[in-house]
């Protein structure tokens, strides 16, 4: 035997017995781009092709359609498509004066779920019932006299409803475009298979039974789908298959549909359709290829030798690994090249493997429909109950809300009326100002001339409550002092009227202090305490240089001082009776300690300059003991009331 007989990698050339031996050359390899791609699965094809593939650009007409100036302008009013002709479309959410279309006004677009040669499919929520629908919108404007103008909409309306067909709601025309509103499913079979790849056989049987029921329903009504493929098969949330997209449906009762029949997708097209017209057997062939793709994850070719290989039944055995013999036999019968040898939909339903699963599948679909209906009913009842309760309890909730709002206003008003207590005047309190003036706090906040800041001494521009400064100083002896000192202003203005002013001018009405937190040094004497300890003659005059007048002035000073002491005692008594046990502000001296420190003598002022002076011999002064300092009497001489009282205005005992 020649060595080259079994060599498949070189060309064998037959030569005669007398001819010389010809050297065989290796066969020229065929480029990869020109090789015929064998049958493969989708996973294998994805491994050979790049992950990202740019989609083909859409055809867009950049030049607008030219119209004659004499052409009649078309009406843009939406027209409802019905079997008896177009009718006017109405909706409570549609406004004719609005420039938006009926679809944009009545529906709220969520996303685009599909694109095709006919148009785009949107997932939109209807504002009339707040439910999601699938709305298919044609891309190109429809021709006025086209025979297939309402073909898909009419097919939906002619076909009786079925549980395995996509439910149709309505269709309308607007601005030469057709809108079809149908049921919204969860995903298509193509999307489901691209994620799951080879499906379990139990799911394959369920898909097979559902699609067979849909095809049988169409064939029993003399309808041919002519476009059965995974892209037009939809799955619900309960994994129930439904057949949709009736754009190429052929009604055998309508001669126009038979004449204008179009071919579907070439991947799932029966071979006899290339030379003829679609039939019931062509739908069975498309259904068989669809089940084959779902069961084996086969990458179905659209043309070439692989396309004919499937039509001839030359499918490798490796694709049927793990598939039962019953399912394989049914698939091979359905994709038979001869249309007469293919089983009909009625014959497939009578098959033993399908008949046993048909009843269980019907019960499952019925139970899911009952479950969805019960859920919708309960949700409707719940909504009505909530509406009823809201109507019943709405007045109660409004009343309760009004009470809470009023309570909040009162609390906020009380908090806002709480005056800030200055740090330097801890003796004042909320009740103190009312006891001093007898006026409510709310009214006091409007007419008080003080700014109640942390500083006890207000600015000079705001001290308008008292009279002008005195022209003379009132001097008292040390023996006239008492525990309680008369108050006066901490500034240059004084609260004590001079003798000359009091005798020469009539008494002016005293303006009461009506602000909470008034410092003790700014108190105004109440008129009721003026004449408590004695009265004086308003006609009496004091001379400037007369000795008799000086004695009278001394007596008048003494009487006035006694009256001031009585007024201070009365005010302190009111403070004690209306005292509220409040925590003293931080960095301030408690009132009890201040009162106890008033009786103690003042601390001596240390003069450190004496230490720097040289001490002369013979003139050394004895050092004064601390005990003597504590027992040293206060300085004699005249001292004004303002300077004496200013020493007790500090908040701590060590102030000078």
Curated annotation (Swiss-Prot):
Its EC number is 2.7.11.1. The keyword Coiled coil does not apply. Keywords: ATP-binding, Cell cycle, Cytoplasm, Developmental protein, Differentiation, Golgi apparatus, Kinase, Magnesium, Membrane, Metal-binding, Nucleotide-binding, Oogenesis, Serine/threonine-protein kinase, Spermatogenesis, Transferase. It is a peripheral membrane protein. ATP binds at residues 113-121, 136. Residues 1-11, 486-505, 646-656 have a biased composition (Polar residues). Pfam families: Pkinase. It is found in: Golgi apparatus membrane; Cytoplasm. GO terms for molecular function: ATP binding; metal ion binding; protein kinase activity; protein serine kinase activity; protein serine/threonine kinase activity. Gene3D superfamilies: Phosphorylase Kinase, domain 1, Transferase(Phosphotransferase) domain 1. Residues 107-354 form the Protein kinase domain. InterPro entries: CC_SR_Kinase, Kinase-like_dom_sf, Prot_kinase_dom, Protein_kinase_ATP_BS, Ser/Thr_kinase_AS. Coiled coil: none annotated. SMART domains: S_TKc. It catalyses: L-seryl-[protein] + ATP = O-phospho-L-seryl-[protein] + ADP + H(+); L-threonyl-[protein] + ATP = O-phospho-L-threonyl-[protein] + ADP + H(+). The active site is at 227 (proton acceptor). Residues 617-631 have a biased composition (Basic and acidic residues). One of its GO terms (biological process) is negative regulation of G2/M transition of mitotic cell cycle. One of its GO terms (cellular component) is Golgi membrane. It comes from the Eukaryota. Signal peptide: none annotated. Acts as a negative regulator of entry into mitosis (G2 to M transition) by phosphorylation of the CDK1 kinase during oocyte maturation. Required for embryonic development, germline proliferation and initiation of meiosis during spermatogenesis. Required for chromosome structure during mitosis and negative regulation of nuclear envelope breakdown. Belongs to the protein kinase superfamily. Ser/Thr protein kinase family. WEE1 subfamily. This is Membrane-associated tyrosine- and threonine-specific cdc2-inhibitory kinase wee-1.3. It comes from Caenorhabditis briggsae. The gene is wee-1.3.
